[in-house]
A protein has these predicted regions:
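C-terminal and inter-domain tail/linker signature
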Residues: 1-155
């Protein structure tokens, strides 16, 4: 799975949203996800059902916004598992450039951001059945110049 993260159809010359979507549907990741997979993201992203739901509601917008990203420079350096559960994480775990408004709708800043992300997995029938993904969105937005806590305090 790790090697498949390096496949970036969104960076190909002439790539369109539809062509990237189709390549993600046909991406090697399909061999790792259970047909009834559930993906649970943080507030602002929500839950996705099935691979197509995951692609449409999280993966495609994320990849279109953060085309220039590096998983390995700082990386998911913690990997543990027990029985049917596993987890990866890092503090910070992804470095990326904010390049479009597809993810969360904020205008592109072209700022380099780091992301605090963890993935918790439930495996069933040899495939990933559920994936919980806490993403520190408040921290990402702060790096883009949006102080969510200050905005809440002002209300």
């Amino acid at each position: 799975m790790q090697r498949s993260l390096d496949i970036k159809p969104e960076t190909e010359t002439g790539a369109t949203k539809d062509s990237v979507r189709q390549k993600l549907i046909n991406h090697p990741q399909k061999d790792y996800w259970h047909p009834k997979m559930m993906w649970y993201g943080p507030c602002g992203i929500g839950t996705a059902r099935g691979l197509k739901g995951f692609i449409e509601h999280h993966q495609l917008p994320f990849r279109l916004t953060f085309k220039e990203r590096n998983y390995w420079k700082i990386g998911h350096y913690i990997e543990i598992g027990d029985g049917n559960y596993s987890m990866t994480g890092g503090w910070h775990s992804i470095q990326a450039t904010h390049g479009s408004s597809d993810w969360l709708g904020y205008e592109p800043t072209n700022k380099l951001v780091t992301m605090r992300v963890m993935d918790f997995y439930l495996h069933n029938e040899g495939l990933i059945r559920e994936n919980w993904v806490p993403i520190d969105i408040v921290h990402i937005l702060f790096q883009l110049g949006i102080d969510v806590l200050e905005l809440v305090h002002k209300k």
